[in-house]
Amino acid sequence: MSDWKGYISAVLRDQRIDDVAIVGHSDNRCVWASRPGGLLAAISPQEVGVLTGPDRHTFLQTGLSVAGRRCCVIRDYLLAEGDGVLDARTKGLDGRAICVGHTPRALLVLMGRRGVHGGILNKTVHDLIGGLREQCS
C-alpha cells in the first residue's frame, strides 16, 4: 500500500481506536507510519525484535514494552499460522488494550481508547491484517 497516511486516517475513523502504527519487522525494523504525535510512533527496533523473536516464554512471564510503555500479554498468537495477533494491556492506572497484527512484511499495532475492550481491537486487527495480506499477495 503506497499511501500509509491515508490508511492511518482510515483506521483512526473508528472512534474506539486511539493510536495506530505500521512497523516493519523483517529488514527494516522501524515505524513506517503512525498517528501524528501518537505514542506508538516511538516503537523501537528492539521492541519489534522482542515481539517477533523466537523467545515467547520470557515476555509472557515478564511482560513487554510497546513504545516504552510496559504491557502484560493477554494472548499471544502473533507468530501462529492462521491467526497472527497478540493482545496486551498497558500497565498502570490508565490501562489500555493494545493489539498487534502480523503480516508478511509489517506489524499493525492498535491502541484502544480508554475503556475499550481488547476483544473489539482483536477483531478489528484481524480484519485489517486480512486486507493487508491480500494486498501483499
Curated annotation (Swiss-Prot):
Q: Does the keyword Isomerase apply?
A: no
Keywords associated with the record: Actin-binding, Cytoplasm, Cytoskeleton, Lipid-binding, Nucleus
Known tissue expression: Testis specific.
User: What Gene3D superfamilies does this protein map onto?
Assistant: Dynein light chain 2a, cytoplasmic
Q: Which Pfam families match?
A: Profilin
Major location category of this protein: cytoplasm
List the SUPFAM superfamilies: Profilin (actin-binding protein)
Q: Where in the cell is it found?
A: Cytoplasm, Cytoskeleton; Nucleus
Q: Which InterPro entries match?
A: PFN, PFN_euk, PFN_sf, Profilin1/2/3_vertebrate
Family, per the entry?
A: Belongs to the profilin family.
| Function noted in UniProt | Binds to actin and affects the structure of the cytoskeleton. Binds to poly-L-proline, phosphatidylinositol 3-phosphate (PtdIns(3)P), phosphatidylinositol 4,5-bisphosphate (PtdIns(4,5)P2) and phosphatidylinositol 4-phosphate (PtdIns(4)P). Slightly reduces actin polymerization. May be involved in spermatogenesis.
Describe the subunit structure: Interacts with ACTRT3.
Kindly provide the name given to this protein in its UniProt entry. Profilin-3
Query: What gene name is listed for this protein?
Result: Pfn3
